[in-house]
Amino acid sequence: MSRIAPLILALCALIAVAALPGDARASADQSMTFEAPVDLANPATRTQAFDEISSFGVKSLRIVMLWQNVAPAATSRIKPDFDATDPTKYDWSAYDPQVDGAVARGWKVLLTVSGPVPRWATNGAKDNVTRPKPKEFQAFVTAAARHFGTKISRWSIWNEPNQPQFLLPQYSAAKHTPLSPRIYRNLFLAAERGFAAGGLPNAQVLIAETSPRGTGKVVAPLTFLRGMLCLDANYHKQGSCAELHPAGYAHHAYTTASGPLFKPRQPNDVTIGVISRLVTALDRAARAGAIPAKLPIHLTEFGIQSTPDRIQGVSLAKQADYRSIAERLAYQNPRVVAFSQYLLRDDPPNPNATSPIDKYSGFESGLRTNTGKAKPVLTSFPLPLAAFRQGSKVSLWGLVRVATGATPVTVEYTSGGGFKKLFTTTTDARGYFTRDTTFRSGRRYRLTWTAPDGRTIHGTTTAVYKR
């Protein structure tokens, strides 16, 4: 075949793909992962939390395991005399019930092994995040692999390693050069050795787990990616770093109060509205020989902040709309294989706060308030619906999350009075559908689904957004 023929075929393929509606290029197998650390850690609320999450149709749980929480003498500057690869030397009691509860329900578990770390496991032993020792981390991962074994479906290394509360230093003091990416690379390689030594040589391990935006103290996610993979600003290899072989790339694509369609000006930031930036960066890194081609993306932590957060919080109605829109954006990207919901209940307020801003400085991204009161997003989560205006049309995307196969679902609309039926359609085998309707000013939409037991379930009413 001549050199021109593949180019013609590739061009034809691109034209054909471009002609498809956006959702037609969606991931063929996108899963939803839930994270509810407070509710699942508390024995008094654990069973109820598991049952409620299960009622949504979710079958995957993310747990962040902090090394310092299980290690002996974590606050000591001097390492205790023990075999760090022996799982019996650690206290796993904070995490075992969560893992076992998920496994008993047939769920998949993503375990993120992260800092902060034991003080004795850092260079200089001055705190719990500065330059963790790769050799010590390897030993800990070996112990974790031996303890949990195949109960864990996927592992991930470090939570937000581009954030100073989890890893230091982020930058050099003199030239403000990013340092955390190379520190992290060594920790990831140490973890791979640890899994092999712990009897899991074929463990599915995700890399990165980066937060979405950079600052003077936080390394931007794409800057972090390039540094971790030994690439310059143009994605050319620097030095002799070997190719890494993670099972996927993990990222936390949080957005701002502007909503999921927000596009940050900083080109190295990656929020949900510009997830294509991460796809492009991964493809360029693959062409440079730094990672495998077509690495799948796992959006392992996500949520929409609501009131009473006074900085990033949106109204309760917008929280429901924005979360559904964000899930649609993830669904539309064929490289995104996993999306997530962070929190069942909001974080509790800070009792020692001296201002309203400090009082709600945690996460208000839950489906319920911190007291357990249902938010509108609790109703929309099992039946998300996102409506985009496209000229004279409205593109409706929805999901019956609890569905176990193709199922009928009805779209209803209101213009301020009662609800009327717009149409009934049948979802695909995973519960998704996409359908167009004529735009009518003032209309709002919701999903209505009849469960197998005969119950009629209504989703939250959503507005139409211009993409």
Put a short name on every predicted segment.
Residues 56-218, 254-256:
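Substrate-binding cleft and catalytic face of glycoside hydrolase catalytic domains
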Residues 34, 61, 102, 144, ...:
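Conserved, mostly hydrophobic/aromatic
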Residues 26-66:
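Boundary/entry segment of secreted carbohydrate-active catalytic domains
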Residues 8-19:
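Bacterial N-terminal signal peptides
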Residues 20-26:
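Sec/Tat signal peptide C-region and signal peptidase I cleavage site
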Residues 43-47, 51, 134, 138, ...:
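Noncatalytic carbohydrate-binding groove/subsite architecture in carbohydrate-active enzymes
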Residues 431-435:
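Short strand-edge motifs at loop-to-beta-strand transitions and within beta-strands
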